[in-house]
């Protein structure tokens, strides 16, 4: 009803002006939320948020089906609101609602000819955490060339400045820390990035301290399964069992919420710079578009000055710039 009211108001303006100057298009936004504490037993992570997103995705799916009929029989449906829909997005704070939560919704809507965008890499416990979230968004949401990634600050901020501002100590929940360390180890192998010895020892100590005997490769495989519906996990492999525990083992989940003090060594800073560079190469090669929102990032305190914005790393006319990523400049202030 709200959309219909807005549509009628805009059409009224157009009729009064005898024009179509008040043009608009619709992008539906899923909203990331922190899961409320529930007394329910046997519920997966983000259970209530997932249920809400599923309901919303179902409603959008029905509307997009109508949109397809609009496009096919335009003369019969002229002015129908569904023909204004051009994209799907997910926004808001991402610390407690990772890309995996939206995987089924994006998959269900992927058959329609619309654009997809996902705000990611803006809120993070560590740059590595933000980079992992970007990687998961691309993988779990099956993003294609031309789809958009919102903000992606973790992809381009300067690690030395970031870590010095945090006094080289980061407070990170244990589950997030383990996942970040495993992701860094596996990506360094994939991208042929050398891990400094002290950093590698730190990674392995963190993983071995949490391990119940599984290999890191099995754990990483379980991380990649997080795009799958947690209600239909099964026990096909060791990775599936690890994924099942991730959702339904109460002791593991409780331990994962404990905040750890992560020490940032000088070698870690340079290592993260190398990982950032490799990921930027990946984004550039696959031609994802980065939505940059400088005024928003400075206004809400992510960055102190405009000249610190990573857009100058993503796409710069300066000599020596190694990247030319597709970017758009947006406000994001409204």
Name each region found by the language model.
Residues 117-125, 148-152, 295, 323-334:
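Short acidic/histidine-rich active-site segments
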Residues 182-184, 208-234, 238, 304-334:
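Flexible, acidic glycine-rich loops studded with aromatic residues
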Residues 1-100:
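Metal-coordinating catalytic core of metallo-dependent amide/deamination hydrolases
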Residues 23-27, 84-89, 115-117, 146-150, ...:
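Structural preference for beta-strand elements that scaffold enzyme active sites
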Residues 98, 102, 125-137, 157-168, ...:
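Histidine/acidic-residue-rich catalytic or RNA/ligand-binding cores of hydrolases
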Residues 57, 61-76, 191-277, 281, ...:
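Long, low-complexity, polar/charged, intrinsically disordered or flexibly structured peripheral segments
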Residues 267-331:
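Generic long, charged, amphipathic alpha-helical segments
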Residues 60-88, 133-151, 312-329:
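Structural recognition of alpha->loop->beta junctions
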């Amino acid at each position: 009803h709200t959309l219909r009211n807005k549509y009628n108001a805009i059409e009224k303006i157009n009729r009064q002006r005898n024009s179509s100057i008040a043009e608009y298009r619709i992008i539906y936004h899923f909203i990331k939320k922190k899961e409320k504490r529930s007394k329910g037993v046997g519920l997966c992570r983000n259970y209530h948020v997932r249920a809400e997103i599923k309901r919303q995705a179902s409603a959008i799916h029905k509307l997009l089906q109508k949109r397809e009929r609009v496009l096919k029989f335009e003369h019969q449906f002229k002015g129908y609101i569904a023909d204004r829909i051009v994209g799907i997005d997910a926004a808001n704070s991402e610390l407690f609602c990772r890309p995996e939560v939206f995987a089924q919704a994006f998959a269900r809507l992927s058959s329609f000819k619309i654009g997809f965008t996902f705000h990611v890499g803006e809120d993070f416990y560590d740059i590595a955490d933000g980079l992992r979230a970007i990687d998961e968004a691309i993988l779990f949401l099956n993003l294609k060339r031309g789809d958009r990634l919102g903000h992606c600050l973790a992809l381009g901020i300067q690690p030395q400045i970031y870590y010095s501002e945090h006094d080289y100590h980061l407070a990170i929940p244990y589950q997030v820390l383990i996942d970040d360390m495993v992701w860094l180890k596996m990506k360094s192998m994939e991208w042929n990035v050398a891990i400094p010895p002290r950093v590698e020892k730190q990674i392995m100590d963190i993983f071995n301290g949490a391990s119940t005997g599984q290999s890191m490769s099995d754990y990483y495989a379980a991380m990649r399964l997080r795009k799958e519906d947690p209600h239909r996990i099964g026990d096909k492999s060791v990775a599936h069992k690890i994924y099942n525990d991730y959702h339904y083992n109460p002791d593991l989940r409780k331990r994962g919420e404990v905040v750890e003090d992560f020490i940032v060594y000088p070698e870690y800073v340079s290592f993260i710079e190398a990982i950032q560079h490799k990921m930027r190469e990946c984004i550039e090669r696959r031609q994802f578009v980065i939505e940059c929102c400088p005024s928003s990032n400075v206004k809400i305190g992510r960055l102190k000055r405009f000249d610190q914005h990573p857009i100058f790393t993503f796409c710069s006319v300066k000599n020596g710039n190694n990247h030319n990523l597709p970017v758009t400049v947006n406000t994001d202030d409204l």
